[in-house]
């Protein structure tokens, strides 16, 4: 028997495929933890944001809280739901590390990740529009910028957007990774 050169597409491909799929599953797990931290931090940061202007009398005070605007409430709820989902999806991610050939759990994660991406991007985008108005105002509608008066409130709401948009980017990567892992099974 004569041994010839291995051509492209031949040879032992099951062992490297399993190793690559395991590496993808480990990266999936790490990204889920990163997204969990970002979305939970965003929800906590926004939910604990408030500021009272100090220069008014005891009878008249101006106070800014996150729940003054329904958009920020939606932002907190969306980030909280996504954080809970990410926490509960970690066992599926661990299962994919242990059983790198599992397809059904990856399909389930792709479907749920896509739904959570939609929810998170809706909450983050809506809050970003209100944060922009808080910083810039709108001259046409006579909405003045409030960030000149409520400095720490605006800094906190702006900062809470960062973790949420990091979560959006991580979800895009998670969906892409799961799609790559599923395509390698064939």
UniProtKB/Swiss-Prot annotation:
Keywords, alphabetical: Cell membrane, Cell wall biogenesis/degradation, Glycoprotein, Membrane, Transmembrane, Transmembrane helix
Principal location: membrane
Annotated glycan sites: 50, 142
Stretches in topological domain Extracellular: 45-73, 128-160
Any one biological process term the GO annotation gives: cell-cell junction assembly
Keyword Mitochondrion: no
Gene Ontology terms: cellular component: Casparian strip; plasma membrane
InterPro entries: CASP/CASPL, CASP_dom, CASPL
Pfam families with a match to the protein in the record: CASP_dom
Topological domains annotated Cytoplasmic: 1-23, 95-106, 182-186
Subunit text: Homodimer and heterodimers.
Function: Regulates membrane-cell wall junctions and localized cell wall deposition. Required for establishment of the Casparian strip membrane domain (CSD) and the subsequent formation of Casparian strips, a cell wall modification of the root endodermis that determines an apoplastic barrier between the intraorganismal apoplasm and the extraorganismal apoplasm and prevents lateral diffusion.
Family per record: Belongs to the Casparian strip membrane proteins (CASP) family.
Identification of the protein by name: Casparian strip membrane protein 6
Organism: Populus trichocarpa (Western balsam poplar)
